[in-house]
Amino acid sequence: MKRFSDLNQIDISKLEVFFQPAKKTKKQTVVFAHGFSVFHSYFQSFYKTLTDYDYYAPLWPGHNVNGFDYKELSPIHYGELLAAFIENKDLENIVLIGHSMGAAVCSYAMNLLNAKRVEKLILLAPLSYCNLLRYFKIKSSFKKDKAERMANFKAMFQTKFSNLTDENSWENELSKHSKMAKKLSNNILKELPVLNKTYKNLKLPVFLVLAQNDLFMPTKLTLSYFNKYLIKNNNLQSSVILNSEHQMFNSKYESFCKAMDDILNHNKLSKIY
């Protein structure tokens, strides 16, 4: 796709965004960038606790409800959409959170945004070159037996397809989603050099949260890589959530909430939770 430097040129008219308004006096605005092959609701165990924050979660093409064009399946394009959305809504005082692929999307968006809009960036199990060391494990996820793939798909997308009742409809949606995911994974590999480089440009406070038992990335190497090579402006705090998996907000909910409370309310992060 054509790349844009002027955010006004980016069409966000079809971008679907989930919004949860603050129930109390708003502290800040949280914007969440979801990861690969998921629906935004996989983060709901945590975002439902954000009663003091306006909460936005854009749905990237391929993961949204109302259809997409295959040329839109691009993390770089998602970053452009994210930046254009924030500028268009004139959002300020933002806590920007990205999980997995979404972390790289956030990092790319920061290169396009007015940096003063975002107060802190939270990277949850971020996509980087380190993921290549788990490439074959990631690839094998596409080759699980049909029953397992269907069970995982239903668990992740039940909210999106709540109207589906028969198995044939579910199988049709899974087939379409699998085709999308393979195309997007190929584009992630193509765009990874650009995405990886954007982390080096981050100047705002950054909080890196990793899962101890992450199947999609080598946790210790990722921790070292970000601290030694990617973010070297003394603006990075990092932590590992013990006994957690890639979606640490679901596998170790209480520990994750403690880490997020420290970040959101105290601007600090312990080494482990």
Curated annotation (Swiss-Prot):
The active site is at H34, S100 (charge relay system). The lineage of its organism: Bacteria, Bacillati, Mycoplasmatota, Mycoplasmoidales, Mycoplasmoidaceae. Keywords: Hydrolase, Serine esterase. This is Putative esterase/lipase 3. InterPro entries: AB_hydrolase_1 (IPR000073), AB_hydrolase_fold (IPR029058). It comes from Mycoplasma genitalium (strain ATCC 33530 / DSM 19775 / NCTC 10195 / G37) (Mycoplasmoides genitalium). Gene3D superfamilies: alpha/beta hydrolase. One of its GO terms (molecular function) is carboxylic ester hydrolase activity. Its EC number is 3.1.-.-. Belongs to the lipase/esterase LIP3/BchO family.
